[in-house]
């Protein structure tokens, strides 16, 4: 039995998601025992609270396994990796159990992307919490016409384009020299991957941050016809692609945050401390 924020008693259903590492399994067993001891249900059905144990990959798997269900509250327990999405430390399991039991937390609403690829043989749809990467299938130079709300932004030439959410700004985007965006903002960021600039081709070489109302479309041009789509790290090959449409979903995922959660402190802790 747990207590809601208005003081009423209820039964809370949770589900644990973890990878196959021995450390994650060990933490899952400990946490399951602690939660059940407090009357919190741990099961396999669709939960009210989803708890990922591991690194950011475990968190992404949890959200995808629930098809980005926006009724679920999501949170992660870090098992020692960098983990921007997994906030709880293994040493905080007792405190975390009390937090869940007493609903003593705040909620942050975070954005995810809807990606639609239109090809000669049909339409493909993806959802991404971190990013989508669009490249030439053969990993040769990628040629893409880029539009925002159907207005030309540029004709890109380079390795590919990465479009990330604020949550994904600290993942692959950061390796591509993209900007860190605070997780409670609702934006998209276009980050060029190895853009080519010479007297023949001129590309924007800096990341561009767009508001959530915008719709990005990428059209294969010149020698690019077949695409590789990386959606949160999962690879898909699309033959004879016509265009890729990327936008922020109007619905938001709900993430549990501890009351002392502070993104500035997290950035400092992950990169500088």
Regions found by a protein language model. Name each.
Residues 1-11:
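N-terminal amphipathic/basic-hydrophobic helices that include classical n-h-c signal peptides
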Residues 11-44, 83-160, 170-273:
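Catalytic phosphate-donor-binding core of small-molecule kinases
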Residues 35, 66-67:
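Active-site catalytic pocket residues across diverse enzymes, especially alpha/beta-hydrolases
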Residues 44-62:
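Short, well-ordered secondary-structure micro-motifs within conserved domains or adaptor modules
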Residues 55-58, 80, 167-169:
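Short glycine-rich anion-binding loops that position phosphate/pyrophosphate groups of nucleotides
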Residues 61-66, 173-177:
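Short Gly/Thr/Asp-enriched flexible loops that form oxyanion-binding sites at enzyme active sites
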Residues 72-73:
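Proline-centered loop/turn at the N-terminus of a beta-strand
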Residues 163-164:
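Conserved beta-strand-loop-short alpha-helix elements that form
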């Amino acid at each position: 039995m747990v207590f809601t924020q208005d003081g009423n008693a209820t039964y809370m259903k949770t589900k644990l998601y973890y990878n196959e590492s021995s450390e994650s399994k060990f933490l899952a067993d400990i946490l399951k025992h602690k939660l059940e001891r407090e009357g919190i249900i741990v099961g396999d059905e669709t939960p009210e609270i989803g708890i990922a144990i591991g690194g950011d990959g475990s968190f992404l798997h949890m959200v995808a396994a629930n098809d980005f269900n926006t009724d679920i509250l999501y949170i992660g327990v870090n098992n020692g990796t960098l983990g921007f999405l997994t906030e709880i430390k293994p040493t905080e399991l007792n405190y975390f159990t009390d937090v869940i039991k007493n609903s003593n937390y705040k909620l942050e609403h975070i954005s995810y992307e809807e990606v639609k690829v239109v090809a000669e043989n049909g339409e493909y749809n993806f959802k991404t919490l971190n990013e989508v990467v669009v490249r030439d299938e053969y990993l040769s130079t990628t040629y893409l016409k880029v539009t925002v709300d159907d207005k030309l932004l540029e004709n890109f030439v380079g390795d590919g384009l990465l479009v990330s959410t604020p949550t994904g700004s600290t993942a692959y985007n950061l390796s591509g020299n993209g900007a860190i965006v605070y997780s409670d903002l609702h934006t998209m960021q276009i980050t060029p991957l190895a853009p080519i600039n010479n007297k023949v081709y001129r590309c924007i070489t800096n990341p561009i941050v767009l508001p959530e109302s915008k719709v990005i479309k990428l059209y294969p041009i010149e020698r690019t016809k077949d695409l590789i789509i990386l959606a949160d790290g999962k690879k898909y090959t699309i033959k004879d692609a016509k265009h890729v449409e990327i936008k922020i979903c109007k619905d938001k995922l709900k993430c549990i945050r501890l009351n002392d959660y502070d993104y500035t402190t997290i950035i400092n802790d992950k990169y500088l401390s």
